[in-house]
Each structure stands twice: as structure tokens, then as C-alpha cells.
Design a protein with these regions (language model features):
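Short, strongly hydrophobic alpha-helical membrane anchors
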Residues: 1-23
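Alpha-helical membrane-embedded segments
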Residues: 26-44, 212, 216
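Membrane-interface capping segments at transmembrane-helix boundaries
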Residues: 45-49
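Electropositive, gly/pro-rich neighborhoods at or near active sites that engage anionic ligands
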Residues: 50-214, 218-220
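Conserved mixed alpha/beta catalytic, RNA-binding, or beta-rich assembly cores of soluble enzyme
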Residues: 160-338, 344, 374-381
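Conserved acidic residues
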Residues: 275, 366-368
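A short, acidic, amphipathic alpha-helical segment used as a generic capping/interface helix at domain edges
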Residues: 347-362
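Short beta-strand immediately N-terminal to the catalytic nucleophile in serine-hydrolase-like folds
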Residues: 371
Length: 381
């Protein structure tokens, strides 16, 4: 409505000078009514054209980020995997993979159906990486898998935004365009985070999501570890007069493991004789909260589709074991970007919080489980 405001101002000036040129007054009046009529009948269309222009600009940026992600994935596979043939075509096919969730009309047993689908997906991805990069070792293969998944996420984000942009342009529906335009800032922030994650995965650098795994790695440092469950390790560590079973995903490759199975197995090995479980994980911070801020509470601190959380809660209920949680607050971008100093510096604070929880909630001689949750890329045992 800026043009209408301008015309009103000019009209007022003319009205204040009644002895001015009458032709100028007529021109101003005609222009004012012309602009008013245009905005009355075509205001919504003009507004939509402005929105489409904004979405189009973001779409071009998303396309560039997506193409750079694909390029990084191809170059990393070539450098590490040393394939005989060009992997670009297979990578393009990989980027279009999808996963169909289980039918939820009958919820009984849906967790096991979901776990089966996720296991099949994980196996398929690992097989694809082996075919693309035959020379990669296990750690490199895990990092490549994470790299490709980040590139896949960027490809998916771009296609969704493009879909609504073209749909809005085709139907000329203000509400279709308005919806996508309103969430664009958050979408762009997420896309830029995945772009940062691509480089971290390609170079095997720790990421913000690995904060929990980093705490566990510090606690188990210098102690013998053993494999437990899939892609998980556990170390028996003396901790403030208690016996602590410290669990994390097996690093330093990009892994999250199956902490649900690992915690269940340790509980079963000790016949439920566990005083408490303490879970450590990164959590989404709210605007205004400090990066790396530490908080504690109760419950299974673990993200993902829910399979591991379900298994942990089932084991805890079976033996009536209390569960405590310590979280490190991060932005969504920090979680998948290279580990920031503020998050790294918070690790000692987290260990101190865990120490307080163990001292206050258990007694000497008790057994406790401390589980560091998160992607352990770049973090060893």
C-alpha cells in the first residue's frame, strides 16, 4: 500500500494549494483513483507475485546448496572409495531413495515393524556404500553413509520447496504460496545446517549431536571396552564408589548404534540389579537460551523414530529402575554442524551433573548405567 500512501500525500499537498494549477490537481486525482482501483482488484495478485519472487530466490539458493552437496558426495566417494566406474549415476539413484513406514491402523506390534523397516534400510544403505566405495574401510564407509544421507536430505528439501513453488505458480493460489513463504526462513536454516554437516561427515569431524557420545568417551577413557548390541560398546568404570556401565555408539565412524538394545542387554546381564540409568544427549534449545547450556530431568533422553526409547522404557518398567537425563542444549543447525567450542566446553559441566545425580540418587556399591547418546563421528572410545 506504499503507492496509495504516496498518492494520498500528493493529493493533500494539492488540496493545501487551491490556487495551484488545476491540471496538476486533476492528474493527481486520476492517478490516486487509478492506483486505488488497481490495488483493490489486483492487490492480492501483486502480493502473490512478490511472494513468488521471494520463494524463487530461495529456491535458486537451495538448488545451489543441493548441487554442491551432490558434488561433495561424489568427490568424497571417489577420493575414499576409489571406485573403478564413475559413481555419479549410482549416487543420483541413492539420493532418490525413500522409506515407507509401517501401517498404523492396528498399533499392536508397530514398534517391531518399524524396527524391521529401519534395519532393512540401514542394511541397504551400507550395501550401496560398499558398491560405490569398495576401498573404504568400516569407519570410512559409515562416514560416507552419513555424507550421502545429508545430501539426500538437501535433495528432498529442494524438491519439496520446488513442488509448492510450482504448484502455487500453476494454480495462482495465494494460500499455497503464503504457506511456503512463511516457513522459508526455517527451511533455509535447516538446509544450511545440512550443508555444513556434509563437510563434517566427509572429513570425519565430530558434530554437535555427538555431545552425549563425547561425555561417554571421556568417562570410559583408559578402560577396556567390549561390543554390546549393534554398533555399541560398553566399559565398566569405577565411578564415585559405584560401578558404572558406560555405553556409547562405536566410533570414530559415523554411528548412532542401537542404545536401546545396549541398555536392555546390560540390565538383563545384571538381572535388573541397576540402581539408576542416566542418559546424556543433545537437545533442541529455545531461542534466548545459551548454546551448550546443561539441564537435567527424568525420562529417556533419545531422539529418532522411537524404537530405542520404547525398548529402554520397557526394560526400566520391568525392573522398576529410575531413569535420569542430562541434556546439552543446541540449535538444530549446531546439532549437525562441526562441533562448536561452546558444546565441547560444556562436557565437563555435564560430567559434574552426572556425578551429582549418581551421588544423590544412589548409594556406594550400586550399579549404574551411563549412556551417551548421539552420532559418534570423529569420537573414539
Amino acid at each position: 500500500m506504499g503507492a496509495i500512501g504516496l498518492m494520498l500525500g500528493l493529493q493533500n499537498q494539492v488540496a493545501q494549494n487551491p490556487f495551484g494549477d488545476s491540471s496538476i490537481s486533476w492528474i493527481m486525482n486520476i492517478l490516486f483513483y487509478a492506483v486505488f482501483v488497481v490495488f483493490m482488484f489486483y492487490g492480492q495478485r501483486i502480493q502473490m507475485m512478490v511472494m513468488l519472487r521471494e520463494v524463487e530466490g530461495s529456491l535458486h539458493k537451495l538448488k545451489y546448496i543441493k548441487e554442491e552437496g551432490r558434488k561433495t558426495a561424489v568427490e568424497t566417494v571417489k577420493e575414499i572409495g576409489k571406485p573403478q566406474a564413475d559413481p555419479a549415476a549410482r549416487i543420483d539413484r541413492f539420493l532418490e531413495y525413500f522409506t515407507i513406514g509401517p501401517q498404523g491402523l492396528d498399533p499392536a506390534g508397530i514398534v517391531w515393524k518399524l524396527e524391521h523397516i529401519l534395519d532393512v534400510r540401514d542394511t541397504r544403505f551400507k550395501d550401496e556404500v560398499k558398491l560405490m566405495a569398495p576401498s573404504a574401510d568400516e569407519i570410512q564407509a559409515n562416514n560416507l553413509e552419513n555424507t550421502l544421507e545429508a545430501a539426500m536430505a538437501l535433495n528432498y528439501i529442494y524438491k519439496i520447496i520446488r513442488h509448492f513453488y510450482l504448484l502455487g505458480k500453476k494454480t495462482y493460489s495465494l494460500y499455497v504460496v503464503m504457506q511456503i513463504q512463511m516457513i522459508l526462513p526455517m527451511v533455509m536454516k535447516e538446509a544450511e545446517a545440512y550443508a555444513s554437516a556434509l563437510k563434517a561427515f566427509a572429513f570425519g569431524q565430530p558434530i554437535g549431536d555427538g555431545a552425549g557420545a563425547l561425555v561417554a568417551a571421556k568417562l570410559m577413557q583408559g578402560h577396556e571396552t567390549r561390543k554390546i548390541a549393534k554398533d555399541c560398546v560398553v566399559a565398566t568404570v569405577p565411578f564415585e564408589g559405584r560401578t558404572a556401565f558406560v555405553i556409547k555408539a562405536e566410533g570414530p565412524g559415523g554411528n548412532v548404534g542401537k542404545p536401546g538394545d545396549a541398555i536392555k542387554e546390560v540390565i538383563d546381564e545384571n538381572n535388573g540389579n541397576v540402581a539408576t540409568v542416566v542418559m546424556i544427549d543433545a537437545a533442541l534449545k529455545l531461542e534466548g537460551e545459551e548454546l551448550g547450556e546443561v539441564a537435567e530431568g527424568v525420562g529417556a533422553a533419545i531422539g529418532g523414530p522411537g524404537v530405542d526409547q520404547y525398548k529402554i522404557e520397557e526394560s526400566l518398567v520391568k525392573y522398576h529402575i529410575p531413569i535420569n537425563a542430562v541434556i546439552i542444549k543446541e540449535d538444530v543447525g549446531d546439532a549437525v554442524s562441526p562441533l562448536r567450542k561452546e558444546i565441547f566446553d560444556s562436557v565437563e559441566n555435564v560430567i559434574e551433573r552426572v556425578r551429582q545425580v549418581v551421588l544423590e540418587r544412589t548409594k556406594e556399591g550400586d550399579k549404574v548405567i551411563i549412556a551417551g547418546i548421539g552420532n559418534t563421528i570423529g569420537i573414539g572410545q
